[in-house]
Amino acid sequence: MAGPRRPQPGCYRRTAAAVNLLLGVFHVLLPCGRPGGAQGQAIEPMPNVVELWQAEEGELLLPTQGDSEDDTEEQSQEQSFSDKLFSGKGLHFQPSVLDFGVQFLGQPAAKILYAYNPSRESEVVVNSVFTAARHFHVPPVHCRVIPAMGKTSFRIIFLPTEEGSIESSLFINTSSHGVLSYHVSGFGTRVMSAKGSAEQLPNAYFLLPQVQTVQLSQTQAETTNSSLLQVQLECSLHNKVCQRLKSCYVESDDVLRLQMSIIVTMENTSKEFEENTQDLLDHLSIIYVATDKSESSDDSAVNMYILHSGNSLIWIQDVRHFSQRDVLSLQFEPVLLPTSTTNFTKIASFTCKAPSCESGAREDGKKKDTPTLKACLSSPVVQGYFRMDPSATQFHIENHENTSGLWSLWYLNHFDHGVVLNDVFVSKETKHVLKILNFTGPLFLPPGCWKIFSLKLAVKDIAINVFTHVFLTTNIGAVFAIPLQIYSAPTKEGSLGFEVIAHCGMHYFMGKSKAENPDWEGSLSLDPSTWDVDSELANTLYERWKKLKHGDVCKRTVLGVTRFAHSKKSKESEPFAVFLPRLVPEPGLVLNFSATALRNSMVKYFVVKNPSSWPVSLQLLPVSLYPKPEAAARLLHKWFGTDMQMINLTTSEFQLTKACPYLGVRSEGSRFGILHLHLQPLERKRVGVVFTPADYGKVSSLILIRNNLTVIDMIGVEGFGARELLKVGGRLPGTGGSLRFKVPESTLMDCRRQLKDSKQILSITKNFKVENIGPLPITVTSLKINGYNCQGYGFEVLDCHQFSLGPNTSRDISIVFTPDFTSSWVIRELTLVTAADLEFRFTLNVTLPHHLLPLCADVVPGPSWEESFWRLTVFFVSLSLLGVILIAFQQAQYILMEFMKTRQRQNASSSSQQSTAPVDVISAHSHKSNCKNFLDAYAPSDKGRGKSCLPVSSPQSRTQNATKRSPATCGHSQKKHKCSVYYGRHRGAAVASSAGAPSEDRPAPAKAGGCPAGAGEAWVGLRCAGGLSANLQKSLALPRSFLGKDENTLKSAVAASSPSSECHVKEGAQTCVFPKETDFQVSESVAELKEREVCPMKTPKKLPENHLPRSSPQCQSDLPDISRKNNGNNQQVPVKNEVDNCESLKKVDTKSSSEKKIHKAAKEDGCSEKQDIPSIEQEDPYRKKALQEKKEGNVQNLNWNKNRMCRKNKKRGAAQVLRPSDQSELKLVCSEFERSELSSDINVRNWRIQENPGEACKAGASSGSSLPATQGEAEGYFQKPGKKGAEKSCSDSGSDCGSSSGSVRASRGSWGSWSSASSSDGDRKPAVGPPRCLLPGDSVSQNDFSSEAPISLNLSRNICNPTDVSGLPAPADAPCPSLPAGPAAAEEQGLCAPGDLWPAQPVCVTGGFGCALESGGPAALPPPAAVPSSSFIDWNATCEGQFPSVYCPLELNDYNAFPEEGMNYPSGFPCPAEVQTDFIDHSSPSAWGSPPSVPTAWGHASLISSPPYLTSTRSLSPMSGLFGSIWAPQSDVYENCCAINPTTEHSAHMENQAVMCKEYYPGFNPFRAYMDLDIWTSTANRNANFPLSRDSSYCGNV
């Protein structure tokens, strides 16, 4: 605050009287006066006020100097003003009244009071300034001089300690005017805490430190315009805070020294350092505020505040203290002081924590102890007073015997000079309690021990507790304050006694120093000599006590302490322990540890203190670690009366640790259980004892306290080792702790009313009481059911959390059991785990009514994850189904695309054939439109005819989906085969556009190089032809080249009755060949086109198992499912079983060798077929054309005798059925007829062998034909003009070939019969294979065979040959030479070395066929054509186009080309690598390579037809077709079907040549891998005039 302004000159015009009368008017009229200030206010002297200066509050600051540097002019004006105004009567103050306003409690504030000296002549000396209230404080002022007309300032500090308005007076003691008063006021308020409540302010004490020195850092002053000052402060603590704070802050002189580093910005660096320092001190005020313990803190604190009233910037950089003790804690943060403020800034805080360690045992230490008092200086030592040593004065209080409430006070003077005690008094609060006795006046006390006075308690028989001081004034300027606490305590007799405790004093015993007794320091190692040192010191101390006890006068002893003397002798009964100072505040204290669990520890603390004024060394250890514990125990028993019998001298369960929890320091464990402490005078320390029980039970021991003051001391310890023990449900843990759940039947009866989907779950809840029956508190941390926390195996602990149980307390737990009703007795384990890692195990026992388990098990809901599991399962199954659908869709698309590609190729082939010239191959579509139309046009309806009449027209083939049939084995065929129909009469309307023409006389030029056509082509037995000799079919095996009848004839015969007659072409060309009577021509260009299509045949990937036990290895292992790979639509064309042929051969009449005789035998049975051959009279003019073609080189037709089944087939025109056997996949390769340039009368077919395998494919693959050709066409070839040939093919289905039409209709639409090739789907197109031709050098002579000798060839089922269609050489124009041309080459080279090509499929010729020879003209046989066999043949695969017709009727004139050894192949054929068109025997390298010189053994043998296979039995059950004929015998069919009855001149030869039909069916197995279901298709159902009967056992006439 700035100083007061000077009065303006205008003010002197006022009159002095007006100023004296109206001060208020003067303030108003004086415009230049300071607002709110009282200028020139006079304060009259107060003579009744005595100047006082309290030494307690005499802490000094550097006095603020008066403003004496006023200029002369201002002084003259002020003096004149003062003369006029006051006339030397007093001082003027500004402001007139000092009001501090509102201030928080404990927060100091300061304001400046200015005082003016109005006198112009005299100066005013201010001796002191003081206040009447403790809330206002003024720094000490000593003899401050205010010059005349000068001014000075005083800093008034307001520190409110209570709430409300505070008003007081400030007294200024002057030398000339006396004491002047000045009014000050303020308002105190509490500080609001964060919680909204006002905090209670503890007692605050105002302290003013003194600035001792100010040092300048030269480096800082030289470099910058600021100065770094080191300010050292000293503060002497007055007696109010002496005992609370002195132990922390003061050294021996009771002075707190601090050093503060400040940075001051100098405005004028030219000034001297002393001037700047004085300016700083004038504007800087430093105060301390000491506070007692508050409710929130147990620590006493001193806060340091600074007020800066100048304009320079001051930065407080550091504050530190000089105390050497570690108990002083300083909190400081650097701060920039604000300028020109009235509030102080707190910069540091000091906390003393040393009393906290003692506070815990202070109350205990106040009892039963009479220490010596130590003097505390009651007034600060100011300059001019000598420094006093507090240890120079010692006091002791003596209790009077037999007198309660009376004490004597002794004084020990250690000064070198005497001290005069002027007066003794007590505080006014305790004047009515304590009385001073026996003090006569000032006492001169020379060095020594003196009794100075007595104290007496004025009250009796009243329990009191008083804390007060006794003050002694001396001649040295010091006042000794003796703090005392007087409290009531019961005596041994039970009366109320009083004891006095001195807090600042010392004991009269002092231990020996190191110099006097070095042996004690050496005994700290606890060697065997330790007891010797302790016993010697203890005896010496005890003897001295005896001498001192009998002393009468005050004298010095060897101990160096003056002992007061009693007026009379003490009693002998007084124990030594009463006289001996104790290091333990409670001598009889015993640390009693409560029950402690084993392996657990418990800690308790006790306090040790130093009762003397000298440092004391202590060694604490358990008695068991002492070298001689028994000797130490006897000494303690002697001194303190310890009970030896209860002490365990060897236990190690007690250990020592050092700790002071009030300091917040972690406990420090002792090494080996021993502690070494050093206690300063009156210092206390806490020591912890750790009890770790090793066994159950109570144990007692001692803690020894070795010291250099009283030699030895002790404290008793006692502990109890216990165990945790629980009861649950009134049962102890273990095997007997069974907790039973009783489940009554009434509870489980609710199962009847519950639903499984209901949310209510049946459960049983039971409460159990958990009791702590042990002495230890137990904390249960977890409850487990068989190792699972809180729940498991249907049990669940409700409210499962940690809980604690004190001794003899209990708690209830609830356990819920949810049964799954799988067992009537459930036993589980309940485990309670405690914090001490102990486990208490109990058994949970649940019994359920056994008879209610099934009832309740139905209503138990599934687990929580069950619904999610099923949802997940359904999801994945749906995904799998979707994937399957997608895969099937893609596969179907692929099949459709392949089918469309095949149709496109077939359409292209068909268009090519039709555009060029009539050919002998017809595509699928052309077959649909031509072949079928041909049948419909030339075959009259047979409706209404009787059973014994021949059908008029050739019926249409019955269709069935062939994709369901897959050839699996070469085993027993259980299918009912349809037999093809030969056209009996041809109408005049020739359908040239819709039918394929016969092949040209000259085969198409062969392509060079072999092409990988159908892999593995099978041999199939040829049908038994009517009119052939039975001897011929006995053993004669037909070579493949022999089977190669003209492709046109064979295809026409197959296409009429088979679904494969659609001529389904995969890779090769296909031809529907019509009877010989129809005039069709084949161009060579079309043949070349067909050849290109035949070559890219596919190889099957999967080879099905062959179940033929007697077949050749090639047939057994290499039979594949070829149809699935060579045709996109996976269709098969079955081949008719050869059993029909065998059966029919037995019934065929012997034909004459002449062609006429053959045609006359119109009704001769060739096979058990169901259709009669039309008469010769019904033939068309095409017959003549066919005869003309025959003369031109075509193969003659053989007229078969088929009069046996005429009566049964009068309504139906049966088509020859091409059906494969489900036991084996046998394919017969029928080579295409090589039309030679022979004369027209030559009708003999030349049998020959391909000599060069490399030229195999040159046979004109374009002439490759489809196997399922209409067998009616084949019949047309066997009929002569004007003759009616009848040919029958036997069915092996077990039904009679003469089954009535009614039975056929009964089975319509059922699953009944095995489907045949004729029942396949009309859209199915048979595969074509490359044509076969013989090498040019292998032609057979024209006289090899007789034209009149019928030939019966029986091909065994074991003739299996994997044929290759890759290369089939054929001459372009020249006719095929005869057979004997190249036999040697074929034998040497081998027709097809195994392994040269891809794995070829076996070709098994399983049946037999018969051919009637009518013409003697030689003819080249076409490549072997597929003949209906008793096995399933994949017509879409390997045999595509190779066997275009089932029947290969041969007209042979020379039998020399058929050697006996070459015609019998019971063991199958080898696998030739490139040439598969020839019959190869396993035993002979070349089957047909015999020289032509072999004598002819062919004769006209009657075809003896044995009874048909199960002719009188026919299954009408739908399941009979699914599992085969259940009446089929397990015997070999062929053993009875091929009986040979030689009737011709060749009979003997044929018996040798013929081969008995090998056993084909190993046994009946209805569960064969493949079953061909006879499912009626839409074609048969829609067309009521469908020509082919739907009877599964239907057989057409051949």
From Swiss-Prot:
Residues 1-40 form the signal peptide. It is found in: Membrane. Residues 1146-1172 have a biased composition (Basic and acidic residues). The chain crosses the membrane at residues 869-889. InterPro entries: Ig-like_fold (IPR013783), Ig_TMEM131L_3 (IPR055435), Ig_TMEM131L_4 (IPR055436), Ig_TMEM131L_5 (IPR055437), TMEM131-like (IPR039877), TMEM131-like_Ig_dom2 (IPR045695), TMEM131-like_N (IPR022113). It comes from Bos taurus (Bovine). The gene is TMEM131L. This is Transmembrane protein 131-like. Residues 1291-1320 have a biased composition (Low complexity). The lineage of its organism: Eukaryota, Metazoa, Chordata, Craniata, Vertebrata.
